[in-house]
């Protein structure tokens, strides 16, 4: 990026822009080369101005949360990475209506902080997300879920920054499937989720805490949490478990370079230290090929490659 464009971009935000920032520092896999720039925006005005500038200058860009579902290329990202901070991490609770409460939550909030805030307020509905790394915006796009629950179960709608400005859409207008908002990229190309609205139930702190503790206990028992990973690597096929299929093919512990199919959970790929994006791709292809040959089922990645 030319110096005059760097200066122009820097003037749009309060937080200093980080140039040639390693994305290994911003992804849960701890893998990936540098982005040309990493920009933090703290409100809708900053975001709108940054996006408008990047579009006008034809500079590639994308918003990420905590990089928990991303595999970044070893050569990095030739563009600008945007992080949602400040106002994007707020929670607004409406007065109760009968047995339910509506909450508006910024897209940049971490799922852990959101769940803890709900616990403090005694609001139930999002406990299944407790312990899922990442931020809310990405969770909505992925229709994140676990232990029988998913975002779409309790979502009322979202606010988006689209090419035409801010748009509010209801969950009834959103086509969700397992781990995906299916028509997001088709209907809203390059749109950014600003916030999401949920319908929750006030049940008391102790009830919510009990649910969260139960979910976390299951995670600690079944999932690797000590090594860098991106959570579930493959989508579960209809009526099947990706982890069970991989395990049945004897692939736990399979290693390429410095990445490995976790011995603890077959649908987790872990970075054992110094892994690369190429290692992950090679491991993925081997797992997909073996599972298809032995079961006839084609596994699709849940993670995104950039």
Curated annotation (Swiss-Prot):
Gene3D superfamilies: 3.30.465.10, UDP-N-acetylenolpyruvoylglucosamine reductase, C-terminal domain, Uridine Diphospho-n-acetylenolpyruvylglucosamine Reductase, domain 2
Domain FAD-binding PCMH-type: 31-203
Primary localization class, coarse: cytoplasm
Listed EC numbers: 1.3.1.98
Catalysed reactions, semicolon-separated: UDP-N-acetyl-alpha-D-muramate + NADP(+) = UDP-N-acetyl-3-O-(1-carboxyvinyl)-alpha-D-glucosamine + NADPH + H(+)
GO terms, biological process: cell division; cell wall organization; peptidoglycan biosynthetic process; regulation of cell shape
Family to which this protein belongs: Belongs to the MurB family.
Name of the protein described by the UniProt record: UDP-N-acetylenolpyruvoylglucosamine reductase
